[in-house]
Amino acid sequence: MSQGKIIKVSGPLVLASGMQEANIQDICRVGDLGLIGEIIEMRRDQASIQVYEETSGLGPGEPVITTGSPLSVELGPGLISQMFDGIQRPLERFQTITESDFLVRGVQLPNLDRETKWNFVPSLSVGDAVEAGDILGTVQETNLVEHRIMVPVGVSGRLANISAGSFTVEETVYEIEQAEGSIFKGTLMQKWPVRRGRPFAQKLIPVEPLVTGQRVIDTFFPVTKGGAAAVPGPFGAGKTVVQHQVAKFANVDIVIYVGCGERGNEMTDVLNEFPELIDPSTGQSIMQRTVLIANTSNMPVAAREASIYTGITIAEYFRDMGYSVAIMADSTSRWAEALREMSGRLEEMPGDEGYPAYLGSRIAEYYERAGRVKTLGSTAREGSITAIGAVSPPGGDISEPVTQNTLRIVKVFWGLDAQLAQRRHFPAINWLSSYSLYLDEVGAYIDQHEKIAWAEKVTKAMNILQKESELQEIVRLVGLDSLSEKDRLTMNAAKMIREDYLQQNAFDDVDTYTSFKKQVALLSNILTFDAEANRALELGAYFREIMEGTVELRDRIARSKFVHEDQLEKIQALSQTIEETLHQILAQGGLDNERH
């Protein structure tokens, strides 16, 4: 520990002298209040410190004390269903201790609760050989999450002692005799610096789809477990609702939700809604698998920059246990703005639109910590982190630096469209401008495991939507009646896909989530209708006759998405009805043809 003194305060940036013994990335206690700060630049004995708390009232001459350790998070039981700020301070306990609705400055409290006792059940015995990543035992943290206690990175040897029972996160639970003869005493908790990725044995290719229950995502633009996706869109297009929907219904074990620089009301919505929502696969409250990190727009700017790293480090910890994790960052644009602010205060050379020249590498560092991996440890385990980042480009202009740097790295682009949002089409993901580079892997995985030609159905549906886009140019110029009968059927099929399949009501109890089997049934019915209608047209029926004869049938297809998951046979039975109805129209059309 070394002590310097403040010589300059510039917003969240503090310049201190007499810091020759300090290192870059060291955590400091700044001023008489002891505010938390991190050294981000060293020049001789002067340190530039970004302070994670409000700096008003700080002045030259006040002390700066370094702790000698980097910004780290505490990893152990007590993370799940908790809400932390950007540097992992527990907000609920913070409020209880300070008796204030605001972040009181200079308060020091442990990140994980030191008083709660957790019931530890060992899975190894004394004398067993262990290495980094091995699971020593488990703690049932919530009904959904079994917290696996692992040997910390850099520790290996023989298990000299291990105890069962109830312990706090600070009490010694096991002892490992290392090769050099020293004894490592381990607790339920370990610390890890947030800016350093946790190690793993091997990176694997992600192939299994992340099922979100959102039809436009799962069908056309899927993301894999271990993939990375970006959700750019203008104000009011529905970025936060898309993130919330994925957080609620994704088929993952753990969800980390980082509210980074967005409005406080959005985190309030999460706190109000998540405890009441039931996970479709387990029947438990989804809050029992969720960690919330809140760094809203009225909190200090510098802590935004740390919040993303705090979230991804917690995600890596659960990944190492063998869990699939999804991390939502809402929004990475606000995080980039925090980088821009600090870069400006440091008087660095600006890049595009004032962002620092290293913006691209910082964004890449974050997304590259996602992925599917084979974890450390003597027993083979797989874990994954799926990173989904919202981007808020000013005015919806996706040519700005944050969006462009993000799109260079991620493989899925869910482009939100203001025009679709204005037409009340939600999720407002534009099916013509969005893309997923995981389509082939996901298609092959589904074809193999579900034994259905899913990739073929998706291609047919997308071709119909693309054909509609081409025909709309003609319709705008000369009207719908000028189209051929076949093209008018294509326009009708595209309308059915858009309104009866892609459009989804997040506030309807049934329509908010669609299982994969239901998605297959819904899309199959629309494609069957289009195929049978085209066949009837080729065999002599007229477009008008097909439309007039299928009013009730099309209404039933449209209402199918509101059928409960446990009544799927009703949707599947519609396929037979579609064929019968169009055969009847064809039979009548044959008679009509003689009259025409």
From Swiss-Prot:
One of its Pfam families is: ATP-synt_ab_Xtn
Cite the entry's keywords alphabetically.
ATP synthesis, ATP-binding, Hydrogen ion transport, Ion transport, Nucleotide-binding, Translocase, Transport
The chemistry this enzyme catalyses reads: ATP + H2O + 4 H(+)(in) = ADP + phosphate + 5 H(+)(out)
A GO molecular function annotation here is: proton-transporting ATP synthase activity, rotational mechanism
Instruction: State a GO cellular component annotated for this protein.
Output: proton-transporting ATP synthase complex
InterPro entries, per the entry = ATP-synt_VA_C, ATP-synth_a_Xtn, ATP_synth_asu-like_sf, ATPase_F1/V1/A1_a/bsu_N, ATPase_F1/V1/A1_a/bsu_N_sf, ATPase_F1/V1/A1_a/bsu_nucl-bd, ATPase_F1/V1_b/a_C, P-loop_NTPase
- The keyword Zinc belongs to this UniProt entry's keyword annotation: no
Residues bound to ATP are: 233-240
Would you kindly state one Gene Ontology biological process term found in this protein's UniProt entry?
proton motive force-driven plasma membrane ATP synthesis
Q: What is its EC number?
A: 7.1.2.2
Q: Which NCBIfam families match?
A: PRK04192.1
Q: Which family does it belong to?
A: Belongs to the ATPase alpha/beta chains family.
- Give the function comment from the record: Produces ATP from ADP in the presence of a proton gradient across the membrane. The V-type alpha chain is a catalytic subunit.
- Identify the HAMAP family for this entry: ATP_synth_A_arch (MF_00309)
What name does this protein carry?
Answer: V-type ATP synthase alpha chain
Q: What is the lineage of its organism?
A: Bacteria, Bacillati, Bacillota, Bacilli, Lactobacillales
Please state the gene responsible for encoding this protein.
atpA
